[in-house]
Regions:
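Extended, helix-rich architectural segments
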Residues: 1-169, 178-179
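Extended, charged amphipathic alpha-helical segments
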Residues: 183-230
Length: 230
């Protein structure tokens, strides 16, 4: 399909990517991802519709049918606010990339952090699920250059300024999320040492990540790709 979607282990910017003999599969992946994005998130219109059931509507309006329009207007305000937040965080690009990866590899991770939405391919994270398919643990691997790391993190590494080319070697930082009780807990590590100040927690139903699967198979931690169906 598209070799750059899932590079071989050890690949870098100088690796020569194998070019398939035919572009049919690559075009198919691009077209399918585009059609899925248009269907799921159509431009200039809400991709979901908020509504209330009859009993809740009775409570909100007190049985007055003339107030239904007010309820609908408030719900539309919420819809527009969600759409505005989505556009502000520039989510369409990572969502399109997620769809491409799901088609080819069956797995992709979306993470909503302080800098917006980031996506991670299958070789950048691991996930553990229970037999019911619920996520128990996620670990994300990110690589940074030495000059971009803050001083407190740099002190935890084995970086030596006298090492030849050491300033160009990437440093791996791991972000771990694990479920414990009614909360998700998180912290970061570098070279097996916890980075101070990175600890945090989230409600169990509001984690800042989404480990997506194309086809979920019972008892398996990862999903199956669309291309495996052919």
């Amino acid at each position: 399909t598209i070799p750059s979607i899932m590079m071989e282990e050890g690949s870098n910017e100088s690796t020569r990517i194998h070019t398939p003999y035919s572009s049919v599969s690559a075009v198919g992946v691009q077209n399918l991802a585009s059609k899925l994005q248009m269907a799921l998130f159509p431009p200039n219109q809400s991709f979901f519709k908020m509504d209330v059931d009859r009993f809740t509507l009775m409570e909100l309006t007190g049985g007055d049918p003339t107030k239904r329009a007010e309820v609908d207007e408030q719900l539309s305000h919420i819809e527009r606010a969600v759409m505005s937040e989505m556009e502000k965080n520039a989510m369409r690009s990572p969502i399109f990339e997620a769809l491409r990866h799901l088609i080819v590899t069956g797995n992709y991770l979306l993470h909503l952090g302080k800098e917006g939405v980031k996506g991670y391919s299958l070789d950048k994270y691991v996930v553990t699920r229970d037999p019911e398919g619920l996520v128990k643990q996620v670990i994300i691997k990110e690589e940074f250059h030495i000059e971009t790391l803050p001083e407190d993190v740099l002190e935890l590494t084995s970086f030596n300024v006298n090492d030849s080319g050491g300033e160009h070697k990437p440093v791996a930082i791991y972000t771990k999320f694990y479920r414990e009780g009614k909360k998700w807990h998180t912290y970061q590590e570098v070279e097996d040492q916890m980075i101070p100040g990175t600890e945090g927690s989230y409600p169990v139903d509001e984690p800042p990540f989404m480990p997506l699967r194309w086809t979920a198979v019972a008892g398996e931690h990862y999903g199956r790709a669309h291309v495996e169906s052919f």
